[in-house]
A protein has these predicted regions:
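Accessory C-terminal helicase-associated subdomains
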Residues: 346-453, 457, 473
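Accessory N-terminal region flanking or inserted into the helicase ATPase core
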Residues: 64-145, 154-159, 184, 192
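Conserved short internal alpha-helix adjacent to the catalytic or cofactor-binding core
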Residues: 296-297, 306-340
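C-terminal accessory regions
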Residues: 374-377, 441, 467-534
Length: 534
């Protein structure tokens, strides 16, 4: 994930190791774009004449449009189940609604677009159609280190393997934890040493770490209940003998829960715990939207790192998301990062939208242009209006008009529509300060999902919505042979192992199925016998 990549960058920075021309840190999708697709796209006809990456909002809009065109009258949840992926030879994988997937990909190709999942496929095809490309890239790599390898997909392994096969001198390392393999539903695979060796033609040594420098021993003992492959974990941090606080409440109502969480946060902050050491998480986003707004109102003196429940959805591959970062952050802060983002924007304009900015116009020029236009804004206290104002002037200054570049305007409209939908549907503030808050440094209380929290650690973790149907999800309960038990075990392991000292778990009462049945607590959690604090 992007957040895990940022975490690695921060840890390198603490060691006085900044990512420069010799070190690159990022997601596999970012790697595929920067190292394979952008420089070598001419080798694959599907993207050789340019391409734009659509986001999931645009994807849903396309599928909904096709649904109407075919008069299928499928509901949203039915549309979401349609497999839009392609095989390695660009064939449709969907079985039941093949025409939907076919029309979707025809639409993408006509528009010179690819979706997020196609990034991997396109990169792999480029490496296979021209062996010189793989050799060229591999010859410039000394080492490849893969974190969270248990969540790596088959196609991701294949991309990495192509490079390793073309340079036996590359040092490679795969690090992960089988108990944290929470992306199985997204085809994540934890390959064995033997499988890796066969795939990459490299030899690996297998090693296991038994020490934990994060959680106290009591917490370790608690979340060891959720191990898939039991082995003893020893707490070795300075807090190893601390008792901490572990509670589980399955009787509180969803109406009373926000106030309880507010009081927990107040108590922890008053006891000296930093805001950045507190995390509130849920299995899915939607309970966090209203909870986040409530906490911001009730705790106005607190800062929140709640980018996942903000007006703009995080999308590090999006031109318009990157522009938003520059619009809503201060010009004199983190100049190096702002220059990198500005450079990314210029690259995307060229590679995805075919917009050739003049050679002498560099990242600093873009930053100066944005800063000057921002100072011109005198409209209402509205983040969307500010965004539109600055973007309009940027386009004019760069000679980007709708007649010559219709694609960028189409995607700009999709972006604005999604922002306005998120504000309306989740009752979010549209003030400029609300937009700025989402891009502030991660020093506040974190609100995020169980999947996004992986790789991070906090003194205090507050987990809500631990209910059957959420963990495990209904899709796993109905469609997986073990009814989602394995998935639930791993997700609970990830949630609980984020905490250093304090863990508050809630299976709140008041959620119902579409048939009106009350959702009950996640069974794996409900069955555990433990000496809770409450």
């Amino acid at each position: 994930t992007n957040r895990a990549a940022e975490e690695i960058k921060e840890r390198l920075s603490l060691l006085s190791i900044d990512d420069d021309i010799n070190i690159w840190v990022g997601t596999i999708h970012q790697f595929c774009l920067e190292f394979i697709i952008y420089p070598f796209k001419m080798n694959l006809s599907r993207v050789s004449k340019g391409f734009t990456i659509i986001d999931d909002y645009t994807q849903r809009a396309y599928v909904s449009q096709i649904n109407n065109m075919l008069n299928l009258n499928l509901k949203t949840y039915e549309l979401n189940k349609i497999d839009l992926s392609l095989s390695h030879d660009f064939k449709i994988n969907e079985v039941q609604y093949t025409q939907v997937s076919e029309m979707y990909h025809t639409m993408l190709e006509k528009n010179k677009e690819i979706d997020f999942d196609m990034i991997l496929l396109v990169a792999y095809k480029i490496l296979t159609v021209n062996s010189n490309v793989a050799r060229n890239i591999a010859s410039n790599i000394r080492a490849i280190y893969v974190d969270e390898f248990q969540d790596t997909r088959e196609l991701q392994y294949n991309v990495i393997a192509k490079l390793l096969q073309n340079n036996p001198q590359i040092q490679s390392m795969f690090v992960g934890d089988i108990d944290q393999a929470i992306y199985g539903s997204l085809d994540g695979i934890a390959k064995s040493v033997e499988e890796l060796e066969m795939l990459t033609s490299h030899t690996f040594q297998s090693k296991t770490l038994h020490g934990c420098y994060r959680s106290n021993q009591r917490l370790v003992d608690f979340y060891s209940n959720f191990q898939s492959c039991p082995y003893e974990i020893e707490s070795r941090g300075n807090n190893k003998n601390d008792r901490g606080f572990i509670s589980y409440d399955c009787k509180v109502t969803k109406e009373d829960l926000p106030n309880i969480i507010k009081n927990i946060i107040k108590e922890k902050i008053e006891s000296g715990i930093h805001e950045k050491d507190i995390c509130v998480l849920a299995p899915q986003h939607y309970p966090l939207f209203s909870l986040g707004e409530y906490l911001k109102k009730e705790l106005p003196y607190c800062n929140f790192d709640a980018i996942n429940i903000s007006p703009i959805k995080v999308n590090n591959h999006s031109l318009f998301f990157k522009l938003a970062i520059l619009y809503f952050t201060e010009s004199g802060e983190k100049v190096r990062r702002r220059k990198l983002i500005a450079n990314d924007i210029l690259i995307i304009l060229k590679n995805e939208f075919g917009i050739e900015v003049k050679d002498y116009f560099i990242d600093l020029d873009l930053l100066q242009l944005i800063n000057s236009v921002k100072r011109m804004y005198s409209g209402d206290d509205n983040g969307v209006d500010l965004y539109k104002f600055v973007t309009k002037h940027i386009f004019v200054n760069l000679n980007i008009d709708e007649k010559n570049y219709p694609s960028i305007f189409k995607h700009y409209l999709f972006f604005i529509n999604e922002v306005e939908d998120r504000i309306k549907n989740n009752s979010l503030s549209s003030s400029v300060s609300s937009f700025k808050k989402m891009f502030k440094s991660r020093d506040g209380i974190t609100l995020t999902t169980a999947h996004k929290v992986k790789g991070n650690e906090y003194d205090t973790v507050i987990a809500i919505n631990l209910l059957n149907g959420k963990i495990p999800h209904w899709n796993e309960i109905f469609n997986v042979s073990d009814k989602g038990i394995s998935s639930a075990r791993k997700l609970l392991y990830v949630i609980c192992s984020r905490a250093k000292n304090n863990l508050f778990l809630f299976s709140e009462v008041g959620y119902f199925t579409s048939k009106g049945d009350l959702l009950y607590p996640t069974q794996l959690l409900d069955k555990i016998e433990f000496d809770y604090n409450i």
